[in-house]
Design a protein with these regions (language model features):
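Short, acidic/polar
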Residues: 263-278, 336-352, 400-409, 521-534
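Conserved, mostly hydrophobic/aromatic
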Residues: 284, 361, 418, 459, ...
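Glycan-binding loop/region signatures in secreted carbohydrate-active enzymes
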Residues: 238-241, 463-529, 561-562
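Substrate-binding surface in catalytic domains of secreted glycosidases
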Residues: 294-301, 345, 368-489
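SH3/SH3-like beta-barrel fold
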Residues: 101, 200, 213-217, 225
Length: 562
């Protein structure tokens, strides 16, 4: 009996031990395979001071810490930050100490702390909150108002306070959550949770890592979700939000523009002889106006007689405005609302007086220090031109990193045509080379189209070339017309050979102790350029300048520009 009892005890002990082992194993498995619910501190993730009361802003994945503020429950962002990173249209005018914003028809003025704003006709508009506030001398704009006027997508996040903004519209790879799921800091169920997302939430796909998918949430977290918890990858392009668009004035036909240089009113009389050998032109841009001082005054060589002659031939006239007077303080000019208004009023009144059809801004001395002020002038002139039915065009350099301050994308919101000057590849003072090689022209047109849109782009080509002379290592050049370059070659008893790479005839030869080089512009080089222009299907071609061309190039231009 005792033996039996002892055996039973032994069995009980063994059973208890087995159960204990099983429980411990189960607990181990539970601990090992149960996802942690621990949340990562958002301030730690974004590397922010937890005591900050500022709003972080993320724009197309770029983080800007301690940027915005919250006032009366609304997010406000610095005006300068908004203009530089989100919407260049919100401009701060130092002279009136107000924010200016232009849509397709009006310019609006917002004073700090006021629940009312006005347009340029004097009409007032009421708001439930001040669009603009001043905090310690810094101008802030209500994000809610900015978002209403910006083509973007955004979400709010908290702890820390943040706005995640998407402006770019490129196609993105995305997935959706199949169920409520955790987005974790690292790939693994023991990694802390960044954010819980709901079933159906869209997440931007970054990459696959084994059983996990790296994603970006709508509030800006980059983390990991289990691959089984999300859908297959799909392509997403955010819906375009309709912005206030300029009511463009575009011609139904391809534009063939000729710049007509005059240095005084008497020069207008040569228009008949100049155009007698230039068939196919439908726009003439005479160099009538030049800014002469920081108050916005201009020299005026305009002629109603020239306009009437052109109209009788079915040719439009776009009066050119230049900024070549280096004595003018352009920073002072463009930053002054009074000066900008003076220029606008002068040009509009002269359009009434002379009857020209458009304005061509040839402002080639804009610097980054005052480029925002220049763009505001373009906006203000655009509104005035639209009201008068005047075409507005701007002349611009080939897009490069050094001239991004011209902001062609912003210009294109307000001007009818952006003319890219696809020349001056080499210029007086540079090394010897082509004024406009074919690759240079092609790149200029393609890069402009990417920023502007083909229906608004006019490709500018040269009717001139350079004759380069190098003596004892010193290079000089002189600009000449097409025939003058040929005459120089013939006078020197030399020949030029076609260069396929640059799309031009090229000559290089010795004259005494000097080397002379010429990259020619003529029918064949113009044809190569016109083929590019036709392929890009842009709005037309502009030619600098009338009188420098061989008459035979016009049939080539007409062949492709139709």
């Amino acid at each position: 009996m005792k033996k039996s009892t002892a055996g039973k005890k032994k069995i009980v002990i063994i059973a208890a031990f087995v159960i204990l082992i099983a429980v411990m194993a189960a607990m181990f498995m539970i601990v090992r395979y149960t996802p942690t619910k621990e949340k990562m501190n958002g301030y730690t993730y974004f590397d922010l001071d937890q005591s900050t009361d500022k709003t972080m802003v993320i724009v197309d994945e770029k983080q800007y810490s301690d940027t915005g503020i919250v006032s009366d429950g609304r997010h406000y962002l610095p005006q300068e930050f908004v203009a530089d990173n989100i919407n260049a249209g919100f401009y701060y005018d130092k002279e009136s100490q107000a924010v200016l914003y232009s849509d397709s028809s009006y310019m609006y003025t917002y004073k700090s702390g006021e629940n009312v704003y006005t347009d340029d006709t004097g009409k007032t508009y009421n708001t439930d909150y001040p669009v603009v506030i001043d905090v310690d001398g810094e101008c802030f704009i209500a994000w809610e108002y900015v978002a209403e006027h910006t083509d973007c997508e955004y979400s709010y996040g908290s702890q820390p306070e943040r706005i995640n903004i998407s402006i770019e519209r490129e196609a993105r790879q995305c997935v959706t959550a199949k169920k409520k799921t955790a987005v974790r800091y690292r790939g693994g169920i023991k990694s802390p949770v960044l954010e819980n997302v709901a079933k159906g939430d869209r997440l931007e796909f970054v990459e696959d890592i084994d059983d996990w998918v790296k994603v970006i949430t709508s509030t800006g977290y980059k983390g990991y979700v289990k691959k089984t918890d999300v859908s297959d990858i799909f392509e997403y392009v955010r819906e375009e939000k309709t912005e206030e668009q300029h009511n463009y004035i575009l011609k139904d036909e391809k534009i063939t523009l000729g710049w007509f240089q005059v240095s005084g009113t008497a020069g207008n009389s040569s228009i008949d002889s100049t155009l007698s050998t230039a068939p196919g032109i439908n726009v003439v841009a005479p160099t009538w106006y030049s800014i002469t001082d920081a108050s916005g005054n201009m020299s005026d060589y305009a002629s109603a007689d020239l306009v009437n002659k052109m109209h009788q031939q079915g040719i439009d006239v776009w009066a050119l405005v230049s900024d070549f007077d280096t004595n003018v303080d352009f920073a002072e000019l463009y930053s002054s609302k009074n000066a900008r208004t003076n220029m606008v009023n002068l040009l509009i009144s002269n359009a009434d007086r002379y009857g020209f059809d458009g304005i061509n801004l040839d402002c080639e001395n804009v610097k980054s220090a005052f480029a925002k002020d220049y763009l505001q002038f373009v906006r203000e002139l655009s509104i005035a031109c639209e009201r008068k039915g005047l075409v507005l065009s701007t002349d611009n350099y080939k897009p490069e990193a050094y001239n991004t301050c011209y902001n062609l994308k912003e210009q294109s919101r307000f001007v009818d045509y952006v003319i890219v000057m696809a020349y001056d590849e080499h210029y007086a003072g540079s090394d010897a080379g082509s004024v406009a090689s074919l690759p240079f022209v092609k790149e200029a047109v393609e890069d402009t189209v990417k920023l502007v849109g083909q229906e608004h782009v006019i490709a500018g080509i040269p009717f001139y070339t350079g004759i380069w002379t190098t003596t004892s290592g010193q290079t000089t050049s002189r600009a000449v017309g097409m025939q003058a370059a040929v005459d120089q070659l013939n006078s020197d008893g030399q020949v030029a050979l076609w260069n396929e790479d640059c799309g031009q005839y090229v000559a290089s030869y010795t004259v005494g102790s000097s080397t002379r080089q010429i990259w020619f512009e003529e029918e064949k080089s113009v044809e190569a350029k016109m083929q590019v222009i036709q392929e890009e299907n842009v709005a037309g071609v502009a030619c600098w300048k009338l009188g420098l061309e061989k008459t035979t190039v016009w049939s080539v231009i007409s062949k492709y520009n139709k």
